[in-house]
């Protein structure tokens, strides 16, 4: 087992940072009245890392203004016991089998994703159902990693980003 960090904010956010990287096997948890975890840029979960964010109030439990990248075996848990989203994420990237459990508040969704162009799978659940603002991609939740297909069908017009496509 790796290191763990638990932060609670009594009148703000549990964690407020930029470029968060949670190393392999490590665990980070944030809880606060203005949100559990807030990143003004990217969040990276390395293999086997876990991130949890909680709030009882009227802000997102997790807010990521950049890309949230999850490596194989990593886990994300978000819970908003107030009104808003469990997580608001600009862009999502998943590699391998990951675990996501997301619960949104009374007037929102478990996961709100601004840009999602590829289809992805995760073990877990999202209540209410994940919402994508821009793009045709979606996240499908399954109850066991064995149900994740080896080749995930992509939406019409999807172009996988590679080093070659990024240079164009």
Residue spans of the language-model regions?
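A composition-driven surface/loop motif
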Residues: 1-168
